[in-house]
């Protein structure tokens, strides 16, 4: 971050970002076809989320022990929490799919997933740049994250319009509305990561 040598906070943030990247990769590529694969999908994403929670616990412990941090303690914590929100959102999506017994995707879910996958790639790049103290190089990637989030906003409106205009089963309307909103919230969490990174740039560049 501010120092040339990677400190323990940079290393922990990188581990968190790598876990998000791996989670998003699995999230996009795993194909749910029946109840068995749906359970496997939800269970695996829960494992990724638990791994992320463990990273957060270590980060908080290290922050509490540290006398000096490379950037403001509160900024590290906010960034950590926003990263964790991305993982929590993905796990929540899989839990909703399992609760609703939805064993197939649709074009809107696929598009949301693609944007979230791209956000995860950009998040990993930004955290690695932060760890290398290349603050000025972060901005273009933060902008990309915000662009993907904006695309998800538009997709959210489009998906709801299609849902309310074409679905006649009221139960499915309720279920898919919650699914789409959960996906849009994941994108919002990605944008929060970008916002926190921009705050760090502003304070330290």
From Swiss-Prot:
InterPro entries to which the protein is assigned, alphabetical: PhoU-like_sf, Put_Phosphate_transp_reg, UPF0111_domain
Phenotype when the gene is knocked out: Non-essential, it can be disrupted.
Family according to the record: Belongs to the UPF0111 family.
Protein name: UPF0111 protein YkaA
């Amino acid at each position: 971050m501010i120092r040339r040598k990677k400190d323990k906070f940079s290393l922990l943030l990188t581990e968190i970002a790598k876990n998000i990247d791996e989670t998003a990769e699995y999230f996009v590529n795993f194909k749910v076809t029946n109840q068995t694969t749906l359970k496997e999908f939800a269970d695996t994403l829960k494992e990724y989320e638990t791994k992320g929670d463990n990273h957060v616990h270590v980060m908080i412990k290290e922050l509490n022990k540290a006398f000096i941090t490379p950037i403001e303690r509160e900024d590290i914590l906010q960034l950590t929490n926003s990263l964790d929100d991305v993982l929590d959102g993905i796990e929540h999506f899989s839990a909703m799919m399992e609760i609703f017994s939805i064993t197939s995707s649709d074009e809107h879910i696929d598009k949301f997933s693609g944007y979230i996958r791209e956000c995860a790639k950009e998040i990993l790049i930004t955290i690695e740049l932060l760890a290398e103290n290349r603050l000025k190089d972060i901005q273009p990637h933060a902008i990309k994250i915000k662009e993907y989030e904006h695309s998800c906003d538009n997709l959210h409106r489009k998906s709801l319009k299609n849902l309310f205009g074409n679905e006649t089963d009221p139960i499915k309307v309720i279920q898919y509305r919650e699914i789409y909103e959960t996906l849009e919230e994941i994108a919002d969490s990605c944008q929060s990561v970008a916002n926190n990174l921009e705050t760090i740039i502003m304070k330290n560049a």
